[in-house]
Amino acid sequence: MRFSAFLTLLLVAFVASCSTFASAESVAEGRRLRADAAPVPVNKDNVAKLAGGFLEKLKTNTALTKAANTIKNSNADEAAVRKAITTFAAAKESAKMSDEGIAKISAMMAGTVQKNPKSWPRLRKFAKVTLGATVAGFAIYGAYKALFDRKSSTAATTTTTTGSA
């Protein structure tokens, strides 16, 4: 498949999935929202627990990646494999968030919300757009590398024989 055909298919899929943007003007409530609508309540404790869980998972995944790379590069050295496993276990134990850490995150978030409560929807939207752009960039880069990388292409070698077999 040629790269231009891939880009065309990607563009068509993007336009098809974004059809709601084209019809957003026809929605009656889309433009005239009531100013006295109640804001969505934010459970600060739940947000802090989610943030703590995210940080814990991030640290664990980083430690797992390092351990896996160490094991791959150890060339079946049993001592290196054991050391990588024990290092990962220690990192996983240290990554667990304590109640004090969650309380610090909760206090920090509460202070930020009290300073500017209207910034959360904009920050959330910015995070989603940034994540979407990053994922799309990685998808395009991966497709480009898969199509044009010389090491990954397994071109069939053609052999010709002369005469009869």
Curated annotation (Swiss-Prot):
What does the record say about induction?
Answer: Expression is induced during host plant infection.
Q: According to the lineage, what is the superkingdom? A: Eukaryota
Cell location = Secreted; Host mitochondrion membrane; Host endoplasmic reticulum membrane
Q: Where does this chain carry the motif RxLR-dEER?
A: 31-57
Signal peptide interval: 1-24
Chief subcellular location equals secreted
**Parts of the chain that traverse the membrane:** 129-149
| Keywords for this protein | Host endoplasmic reticulum, Host membrane, Host mitochondrion, Membrane, Secreted, Signal, Transmembrane, Transmembrane helix, Virulence
GO cellular component labels: extracellular region; host cell endoplasmic reticulum membrane; host cell mitochondrial membrane; membrane
Protein's membrane topology: Single-pass membrane protein
To which protein family does this belong? Belongs to the RxLR effector family.
The task this protein performs is described as:
Effector that enhances P.infestans colonization of Nicotiana benthamiana leaves.
Free-text note on domains in this protein's UniProt record: The RxLR-dEER motif acts to carry the protein into the host cell cytoplasm through binding to cell surface phosphatidylinositol-3-phosphate.
Entry protein name: RxLR effector protein PITG_09218
Q: What is the source species?
A: Phytophthora infestans (strain T30-4) (Potato late blight agent)
